[in-house]
From Swiss-Prot:
Protein known as: Imidazolonepropionase
Organism: Pseudomonas aeruginosa (strain UCBPP-PA14)
Record InterPro entries: Amidohydro-rel, HutI, Metal-dep_hydrolase_composite, Metal_Hydrolase
Note on how the cofactor is bound: Binds 1 zinc or iron ion per subunit.
Source organism superkingdom: Bacteria
Length: 402
C-alpha cells in the first residue's frame, strides 16, 4: 500500500551527506521508502493514503548504537561517591562498579531484567529512536550472559524498534576468575561464544580494552574467536588510557571502536583506513567529569565516521535521552549540529552494520523516520531536555506521537 507523506521538509543524509530537501514529499510502499524528493517533482500515482505533516522536518529514525540497557540493581550510590572525589577505578577496586552490577544481574530473573529494561528504553523510544544496540556483559558466566542475551532478543520482539544484540562477556573479570584473566578469556573463546552464537543470540562481539579490564593481547584472542564464528567485532577502547585498542579494532575491521578519549593520531589513521566507526559517548565523559577530549580533529582529518550514542548504563552514563547526547557532543566535543545528526543516524547505522536498510531517507531503505515540529534540524542539538513534539514512524507505521 502506497502512502504519501507531504507538506514537510527533509534532512535525508542521502549518499552519506547532510542533504536538505525543502517542501519535500515521501512515498512509502509497505515498510519501505518508495520515493523521496521535492514535492513539485512528485510523480502522479494512486496513493492509498495521504498524510499531511504540517510543515514538520523529517529525519531518519534515530539510532542508539551503544547501550547497556539490560542490568540488575542500581548504582546511584556510586554517583554520590564520585561527587565526593572517589574515582571510577577506586570504586571498581573496592568491589563496586561493574562488579556490583554483575552481582545484581546474576540474582535477577529473566522477567525482572525484561521489565526493568523496558522501563529504561521507553524514554529513548519516545525520543525518536527506531533502532538500537544492547550489550550483555553484566553476567560474565555462561548462564547469566545467556539470560541477558535472551532478554535482549525478547526486547527486539516486543519493542517498536530494531534491536541488535552484542555479546560483551569480555567486559570485566568475574570474581570466580580473580587473578586468572587468561583463563577467563579462554573460557569466553572456547565455551561461551560458541554456545551463545550457536543459539542465535549474538549479532556482534565486544570487549573492554583497558588496564582495569583486558589487555590488547587478550582482546585479540576474543576477536579471533569471533571471526571464526563469523561474527563482527566492536571495542571499548582508549577511554581511560592509551593501549591502542582502536588500532587493534581497525586491524580486525571492527564495526566500531567506542569512547576514544585517549586515542592517538595513528589510531585515527588506522580507523580511517579500515572504515571503523568512532562511537563518541559524551554522557560517560560528562558524568565521570573527564578532561581528556576525544581527538575530533584527528578523526576528521582521517575521514573517520563519527557516531554518537547514549552509553545507557547504571554506572557511568544513566542517560535516557539520545537527543541530549547531541547537545553534549556539540558542546563538549565541538561537533557541528550536522555532524551530530549524522552521528545518530547514518554513522550509527554503520556502527551496527545496518546501513543498507537504516540511517538515511533513501529509496529502498526502511521507512523509519521522525517528523519533528521544529524550524530547522539544528534544534535537535539545541534544546536541552523536554519531549519535542514529534511523530515517530517505523516501517511506515506511526508508533509514537507526542
Amino acid at each position: 500500500m502506497k502512502r504519501l507523506w507531504q507538506h514537510c521538509h527533509a534532512a535525508t543524509l542521502k549518499g552519506g551527506k547532510y542533504s536538505i530537501v525543502e517542501d519535500a514529499a515521501l512515498v512509502t510502499d509497505g515498510p519501505l521508502i518508495h520515493w523521496i524528493g521535492p514535492r513539485a517533482e512528485l510523480p502522479p500515482d494512486d496513493y492509498a493514503e495521504r498524510i499531511d505533516l504540517d510543515g514538520a522536518w523529517l529525519t531518519p529514525g534515530l539510532i542508539d548504537c551503544h547501550t547497556h540497557a539490560v542490568f540488575g540493581g542500581n548504582r546511584s550510590g556510586e554517583f554520590e561517591q564520585r561527587l565526593e572525589g572517589v574515582s571510577y577505578a577506586e570504586i571498581a577496586a573496592a568491589g563496586g562498579g561493574i562488579a556490583s552490577t554483575v552481582r545484581a544481574t546474576r540474582e535477577a530473573s529473566e522477567e525482572e531484567l525484561l521489565a526493568s529494561a523496558r522501563k529504561r528504553l521507553d524514554p529513548l523510544l519516545r525520543d525518536g529512536v527506531t533502532a538500537l544496540e544492547i550489550k550483555s556483559g553484566y553476567g560474565l558466566d555462561l548462564a547469566s550472559e545467556r539470560k541477558m542475551l535472551r532478554v535482549i532478543r525478547r526486547l527486539g520482539e516486543r519493542l517498536p524498534a530494531t534491536v541488535r544484540s552484542t555479546c560483551l562477556a569480555a567486559h570485566a573479570l568475574p570474581p570466580e576468575y580473580a587473578g586468572r584473566a587468561d583463563d577467563y578469556i579462554e573460557h569466553i573463546c572456547s565455551t561461551m561464544l560458541p554456545a551463545l552464537a550457536g543459539e542465535g543470540l549474538v549479532d556482534a562481539v565486544d570487549a573492554f580494552c583497558e588496564h582495569l579490564a583486558f589487555s590488547p593481547a587478550q582482546v585479540e584472542r576474543v576477536f579471533i574467536a569471533a571471526r571464526e564464528l563469523g561474527l563482527p567485532v566492536k571495542l571499548h577502547a582508549e577511554q581511560l588510557s592509551s593501549l591502542h585498542g582502536s588500532s587493534l579494532a581497525a586491524r580486525y575491521r571492527a564495526l566500531s571502536a567506542d569512547h576514544l578519549e585517549y586515542m592517538t593520531e595513528d589510531d585515527a589513521r588506522s580507523m580511517g583506513e579500515a572504515g571503523t566507526v568512532a562511537v563518541l559517548l559524551p554522557g560517560a565523559f560528562y558524568l565521570l567529569r573527564e578532561t581528556q577530549l576525544p581527538p575530533i580533529d584527528a578523526l576528521r582529518r582521517h575521514g573517520v565516521a563519527m557516531a554518537i550514542a547514549s552509553d545507557l548504563n547504571p554506572g557511568t552514563s544513566p542517560a535516557l535521552s539520545l537527543r541530549l547526547m547531541l547537545n553534549m557532543a556539540c558542546t563538549l566535543f565541538r561537533l557541528t549540529p550536522e555532524e551530530a545528526l549524522a552521528g545518530v543516524t547514518l554513522h550509527a547505522a554503520r556502527a551496527l552494520g545496518l546501513e543498507a536498510r537504516h540511517g538515511s531517507l533513501e529509496v529502498g531503505k526502511l521507512a523509519d523516520f521522525v517528523a519533528w515540529d521544529i524550524e530547522r534540524p539544528a534544534e535537535l542539538a539545541y534544546w536541552l531536555g523536554g519531549d519535542l513534539p514529534k511523530r515517530v514512524i517505523r516501517h511506515a507505521e506511526e508508533v509514537y506521537r507526542g
